[in-house]
Design a protein with these regions (language model features):
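Amphipathic, non-transmembrane alpha-helical secondary structure
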Residues: 17-24, 83
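Acidic donor-binding segment of Leloir-type glycosyltransferases
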Residues: 21-67
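Catalytic-site signature of metal-activated, phosphate-bearing donor transferases
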Residues: 74-82, 98-211
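A conserved hydrophobic helix/loop-capping motif in glycosyltransferases and polysaccharide synthases
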Residues: 3-12, 19, 26, 36
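Short beta-strand-to-loop acidic/aromatic patch adjacent to the donor-nucleotide binding site
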Residues: 87-98
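A general structural motif
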Residues: 2, 28-30, 117
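Short amphipathic alpha-helical segments
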Residues: 18-20, 47-48, 103-105, 133
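Short, acidic/glycine-rich phosphate-metal binding loop used to engage nucleotide
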Residues: 66-74
Length: 211
């Protein structure tokens, strides 16, 4: 079994470096990491991070790097990323997210035990540093005792690599073509971590409002 870890990126160079260091260390050698840059908008800092992972001459690079313009159409962007993945499964991870180590370690065994499931939802731990009660009220967020926002915030991220499965909608994209789906356990050990600052959260909200 081969898993393609598919990562869209634009300007998240600090978070991307952490994610790539983690994946290179923990995934199987036959798996692949596919990075898709937002063509024309990806920052020089991101390219410097990607360059730092290049293998010496004669050795295989650990990353497959492609370019495609986002142009505000998230489904087209992710569908193009999917087309460059060769794995049996695709795990789409945003550049500013980080999987729990247990999720990566145990993922293949879970997939083997559920061969008829075509998509898995992944719980996500959202945290925002600098968050105030005013922000919470404004965005109507639910915060638990650990400071996690809208837990479990399940994300549709792990899919079989099938031609019938794709994303649709320009914004707030959804996966279609799924016959059977499941959810990873409601536990931190199976989660994605998604930390942000309040400044980045407000920039993101304003960006989505402009689309």
């Amino acid at each position: 079994m081969v898993i393609s870890y598919a990562i869209p990126v634009c300007n998240e160079h600090v978070e991307l470096e952490k994610l790539l260091l983690f994946l290179v260390k923990h995934i199987d050698k036959n798996d692949e990491i596919v990075i898709q840059c937002d063509q024309g908008n990806t920052t020089p800092e991101v390219y410097r991070v990607l360059d730092s992972f290049k293998a010496p001459v004669g050795l295989k690079d650990p990353l497959k790097i492609i370019e495609f313009p986002l142009k505000g159409h998230f489904s087209n962007f992710k569908n193009n990323l999917k087309e460059h993945c060769i794995g049996d499964w695709i795990f789409q991870i945003d550049a500013d997210e980080l999987p729990n180590e247990s999720l990566i370690t145990n993922l293949k065994e879970l997939l083997k035990l559920n061969p008829t499931v075509e998509m898995f939802l992944v719980p996500r731990v959202n945290t925002v540093s600098g968050l105030t009660q005013e922000h919470i009220n404004k965005w109507r967020w639910n915060i638990n005792e650990k400071g996690w926002i809208n837990w479990p915030d399940y994300q549709t991220r792990i899919i079989q690599n099938s031609q019938k499965i794709k994303w649709q909608n320009r914004v707030h994209e959804q996966i279609v073509g799924i016959s059977t789906k499941g959810a990873l356990p409601l536990s931190e050990e199976w989660c994605l971590y998604h930390p942000k600052t309040i400044e980045k959260q407000e920039i993101q909200n304003n960006f989505y409002d402009s689309l």
